[in-house]
């Protein structure tokens, strides 16, 4: 085949393929159609094939319902306004149909809606990316201005605004998600809508996610729901009433357990007002809420300014069905893992006749109201919420409801009457678990204990006499977050009023004398007001590990948390075996200028880890502990442990010792055993030890010197096992005794220009040598010398020697000196005397001869003769050889 024929074949094939695509309607992009009337719009929709963009060329009067049939995928744009002219549905999206709303404005023109109807009825897919839906005025019941209904119906809102609509009947919503539908809100706003709630009106909310005839869901990751007014505020999750639910769900077993679910991950729900429950979100009956993010702020309601939760278990129907069965139908469950609930208010927003709770005449639960046994707060922040009566941050309604909170910090809250951090009514209970419970501190009742405000009581906790002591108790662990101790003290007293007021007693620390650390309060049923004292280090640790923060909230009672039901912080165990120990400080009687306060830290380690600390010599060999006392071995292990940088021990408290507490502190109700998986390990007891902090912020080791103020102090520790099995600790501080030696050089007979002297300690040189010379008057002073080393049993021996001196003598240049040392006197002075040795005498010259010289002459003559004879003999011998 020629190349030309081959190319022609390829082109023909390509044309055939493209023709086939066109024949079957395959398109590379959506078709665009422009229309100028509602009739043209509907015709364009009906004629569309595949994705179609319809541009509205001008504003239009909606004289008929626009229908999106199954199989149609339409995008509307053009930025124009569509105005309703009747109460009919404006847009009807059938199951299988899809409408994307780009930038169209839908003006409701104050027109009504029909019974059980909508303005936009969506049983398919509706995506709102922009535009507006506004100015609808509905007086009919069971209406959703934007209704998404059915298991295959989906509403997605990425932008746009649904705002300023009005509704005045029951079971209504601006946005209704029902019968198994789904709503994804990623952006845009639903704002400033009004739903009447007086007279026969009510049972409505701006957004409704209904658990009716199927489980509906909403996921919110962005956008804003704000400024709406209704009986249930911003979002209702669940159902409006138990009767309404049973009528709709119990006729079909498939719908028995229908729920409405909100997954809140982002966005803002703000400044909404509810007449009854949940200014921001109402989780009612069949509702479920999971909050992993987002902000709920500035909302108002009598029950739960931010969030209100009700399961109706205490209703007549709830009692008739029984708890287990009822909770299957009406879980009203909430799980909060993260997010911010702030600035909400529990206050009266409706007539009192609509409020059935006698304790709510001024609003309860500024941040959250709990009337359910399925509420878990694992994380998140409740800040700056207020309640007119009880529970500024959170309020638990009654028995049998229970709120479960994990790793909670309650701080900086205020009650004008009692219980700045938490208040429990006569039926209220609270428990804090040992290892993952809660820390309370720096809350305030009235003007606080620090100002002795006797008109209030209980800066941190107040609890009223219990109606049923067998089941209603207060259990507060003194083991706070990150295992730092919380010291509980009585802080004023409470009168006999049902909800409790201060009886005018003095505040902490003058409520009881002497002050008593209550330790862990286990099963308290009588009225009590409490102040929590936590070290600054313990506060920092709590802030670091807390997952739930309750702070800045206010109410007359229970600024942070109020409860008529139960609050459980953390998981088991609540009860545990305990030990006590006392740390005492001793000063020398002679030391009257020591510091007035000393910081002591308490540390904890398990016995298994403590036993693993090996004592060694400097060369690494095992230390022979024979003859060492139990306390000496104990302290040696502690010192090695702390010097090693190991992480097997942890500080759990820090207190000040001073004259005010007689230089001692008793630590009570400490954990006897290690906790493993929230249970006691009775095979592994805890060991506690104390160390004091010096002025430089260092922990002073045993038998070591440390600075305390202007003094050098030697700290020593003694541990003695007490009856509980812990070790009482005595810290003895002795001022380090110092001495000095002043050395003066004395010369006898002669002197040099300078000499050097060396200080010795116990026979070994100490420091550099010193020069003695005329410039320093031949005197120097060695000062700050320790009389006895830390840990030693004998005093040091100091001496000074002249450098170069040996055996009492020294040669300097050509001169010889004798060196003598005086003893060190009681004033620490000594003298080194150098005495010049006399110059050695020269050998005596021969005595001159005064005789006649005869003897010397004869001697010379004899010598000369002998020499001559020897020469003669020598020569003769050579000749004959």
Residue ranges and their predicted role:
Residues 20-33, 848-854:
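Sec-dependent signal peptide cleavage junction
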Residues 38-42, 52-73, 79-87:
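N-terminal extracellular ligand-recognition/capping segment immediately after the signal peptide
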Residues 68-75, 91-110, 118-137, 142-167, ...:
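Surface-exposed loop/turn motifs in large extracellular/passenger domains
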Residues 3, 26-48:
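N-terminal capping/linker segments that flank leucine-rich repeat
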């Amino acid at each position: 085949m020629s190349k030309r024929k081959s190319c022609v074949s390829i082109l023909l094939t390509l044309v055939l393929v493209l023709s086939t695509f066109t024949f079957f309607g395959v398109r590379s992009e959506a078709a665009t159609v422009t229309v100028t009337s509602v009739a043209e719009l509907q015709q364009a929709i009906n004629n569309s094939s595949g994705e179609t963009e319809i541009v509205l060329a001008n504003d239009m009067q909606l004289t008929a319902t626009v229908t999106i049939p199954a199989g149609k995928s339409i995008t509307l744009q053009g930025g124009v306004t569509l105005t309703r002219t009747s109460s009919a549905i404006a847009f009807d999206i059938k199951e299988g149909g899809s409408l994307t709303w780009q930038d169209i404005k839908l003006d409701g023109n104050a027109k009504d809606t029909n019974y059980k109807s909508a303005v936009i009825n969506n049983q398919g897919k509706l995506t709102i990316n922009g535009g507006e839906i506004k100015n609808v005025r509905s007086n009919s019941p069971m209406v959703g201005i934007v209704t998404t209904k059915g298991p295959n119906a989906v509403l997605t809102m990425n932008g746009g605004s649904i705002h300023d609509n009005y509704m005045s009947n029951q079971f209504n919503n601006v946005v209704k998600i029902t019968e198994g539908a789904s709503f994804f809100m990623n952006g845009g706003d639903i704002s400033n809508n009004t739903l009447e709630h007086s007279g026969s009106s009510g049972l409505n909310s701006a957004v409704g996610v209904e658990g009716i005839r199927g489980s509906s869901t909403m996921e919110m990751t962005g956008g804003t729901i704000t400024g709406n007014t209704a009986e249930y505020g911003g979002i209702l999750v669940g159902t409006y009433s138990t009767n309404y639910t049973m009528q709709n769900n119990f006729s079909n077993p498939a719908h028995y357990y229908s729920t409405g679910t909100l997954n809140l991950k982002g966005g803002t729900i703000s400044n909404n007002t509810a007449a009854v429950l949940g200014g921001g979100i109402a989780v009612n009956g069949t509702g479920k809420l999971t909050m992993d993010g987002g902000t709920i702020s500035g909302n108002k309601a009598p029950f739960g300014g931010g969030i209100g939760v009700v399961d109706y278990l205490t209703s007549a129907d709830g009692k008739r069905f029984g708890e287990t069965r009822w909770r299957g139908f009406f879980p009203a469950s909430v799980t909060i893992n993260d997010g911010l609930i702030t600035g909400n208010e529990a206050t009266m927003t409706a007539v009192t006749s609509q409020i059935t709770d006698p304790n709510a005449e001024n609003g309860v639960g500024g941040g959250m109201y709990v009337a359910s046994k399925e509420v878990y707060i694992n994380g998140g922040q409740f800040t700056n919420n207020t309640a007119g009566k009880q529970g500024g941050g959170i309020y638990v309604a009654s028995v049998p409801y229970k709120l479960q909170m994990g790793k909670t910090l309650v701080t900086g809250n205020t009650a004008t009457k009692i219980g700045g951090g938490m208040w429990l009514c006569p039926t209220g209970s609270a428990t804090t678990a040992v290892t993952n419970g809660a820390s309370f501190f720096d809350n305030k009742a009235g003007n606080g204990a620090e100002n002795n405000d006797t008109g209030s009581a209980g800066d941190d906790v107040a609890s009223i006499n219990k109606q049923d002591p067998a089941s209603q108790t207060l259990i507060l662990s003194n083991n706070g977050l990150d295992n730092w101790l919380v010291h509980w003290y009585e802080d004023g007293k409470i009168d006999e009023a049902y909800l409790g007021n201060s009886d005018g007693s003095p505040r902490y620390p003058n409520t009881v004398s002497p002050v008593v650390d209550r330790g862990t309060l286990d099963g308290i049923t009588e009225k009590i007001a409490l102040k929590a004292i936590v070290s600054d280090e313990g506060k920092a640790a709590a802030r670091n590990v807390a997952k739930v923060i309750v702070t800045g909230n206010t109410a007359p009672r229970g600024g942070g948390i109020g409860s008529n039901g139960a609050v459980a912080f953390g998981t088991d165990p609540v009860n545990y075996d305990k030990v006590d120990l006392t740390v005492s400080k001793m000063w020398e009687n002679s030391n009257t200028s020591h510091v007035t306060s000393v910081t002591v830290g308490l540390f904890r380690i398990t016995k298994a880890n403590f036993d693993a600390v090996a004592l060694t010599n400097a060369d690494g060999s095992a230390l022979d502990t024979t003859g060492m006392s139990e306390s000496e071995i104990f302290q040696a292990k502690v010192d090695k442990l702390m010097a090693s940088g190991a992480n097997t021990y942890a500080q759990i408290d820090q207190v000040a010792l001073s004259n005010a507490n007689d230089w001692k502190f008793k630590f009570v109700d400490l954990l006897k055993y290690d906790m493993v998986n929230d249970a006691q390990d009775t095979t592994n007891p805890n060991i506690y030890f104390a160390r004091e902090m010096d002025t430089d912020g260092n922990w002073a080791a045993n038998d070591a010197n440390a600075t305390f103020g202007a003094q050098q102090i030697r700290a020593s520790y003694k541990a003695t096992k007490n009856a509980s099995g812990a070790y009482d600790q005595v810290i003895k501080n002795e001022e380090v005794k110092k001495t000095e030696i002043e050395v003066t050089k004395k010369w006898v007979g002669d002197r040099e220009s300078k000499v050097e002297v060396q200080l010795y300690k116990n026979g070994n040189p100490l420091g550099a040598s010193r020069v003695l010379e005329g410039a320093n008057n031949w005197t120097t002073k060695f000062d700050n010398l320790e009389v006895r080393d830390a840990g030693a049993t004998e005093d040091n021996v100091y001496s000074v020697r002249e450098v170069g001196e040996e055996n009492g003598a020294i040669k300097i240049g050509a001169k010889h000196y004798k060196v003598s040392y005086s003893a060190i006197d009681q004033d620490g002075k000594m003298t080194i005397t150098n005495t010049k040795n006399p110059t050695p005498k020269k050998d005596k010259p021969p005595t001159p001869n005064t005789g006649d010289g005869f003897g010397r002459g004869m001697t010379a003559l004899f010598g000369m003769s002998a020499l001559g004879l020897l020469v003669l003999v020598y020569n003769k011998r050579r000749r004959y050889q």
